[in-house]
Amino acid sequence: MKKMSRVALVTGGTRGIGAAISIALKAAGYRVIANYAGNDAAAEAFTIASGIPAVKWSVADYNACAEGVKRVEAQYGPVEILVNNAGITRDAMFHKMTPEQWREVIDTNLSGVFNMTHPLWP
């Protein structure tokens, strides 16, 4: 299989390190799809600047991940490369974090890896 036809999915792929990874994979000849969760304007600007399509869902939501993977594969082909890059922070010291903030961080940064990898596992 030619590298050009290989599909790479990058979570958190429209900003920061994720955007750099997405752009580098595209430059290396991969068909890249960038996932994002929140900032529609930033995702649109990224797509316009890079030519990389952006797809929206939260990696913290298992069902959204499973459905998102299905949509990506239906439109672009099988995902062969997954970069679990999505991550969030809640800028508070541990003793000042609320249980909700803690859960958001764990659901995205830890469970998100499972939520994205599981639907792609052969």
Per-region residue spans from a language model:
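The beta1-alpha1 cofactor-binding region of Rossmann-like NAD(H)/NADP(H)-dependent oxidoreductases
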Residues: W57-G68, P99
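Conserved hydrophobic beta-strands of the Rossmann-like cofactor-binding core
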Residues: V7-V10, L82-V83
